[in-house]
Amino acid sequence: MLTGKNALVTGASRGIGRAIALELAKRGAFVVVNYNGSEDAANETVAAIKAAGGDAVSVRCNVSDFTACQEMIESLIKEYKHMDILVNNAGITRDDLLMRMKESDFDAVINTNPVSYTHLTLPTILR
């Protein structure tokens, strides 16, 4: 059981992230549903968690932005005292061959996928 644990799930407004958030809540964790796109979809995830007897909130944060991640983690620690579980689920793709991909698209993929993990874990590790 995860009762008393706080979990942050990135990209939790839909798909795999939503399923992970629902499962963590089912096991007793308080879940922070991170999203960057649809607030409505994130709120639907929170509502589904609450309807199943769990507890959750939604928080918008572009995980490719280091400063935004630092601010989100600091805010969560201030509000909830500790974050015990981090599920780095957020990810994007730009469907094109690397040789035809625009630099901005490449940067967005790299900054959201592997780099965001550092953005989210570093502020916590340095505490």
Report each predicted region and the residues it spans.
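Structural signature of the Rossmann-like NAD(P)-dependent dehydrogenase/reductase core
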Residues: V9-T10, N88-N89
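Conserved small/polar residues in nucleotide/adenosyl-binding loops
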Residues: T118-T124
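The beta1-alpha1 cofactor-binding region of Rossmann-like NAD(H)/NADP(H)-dependent oxidoreductases
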Residues: E39, R60-M72, E103
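Conserved glycine-rich Rossmann-like NAD(P)H-binding loop of the short-chain dehydrogenase/reductase
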Residues: A29-E44
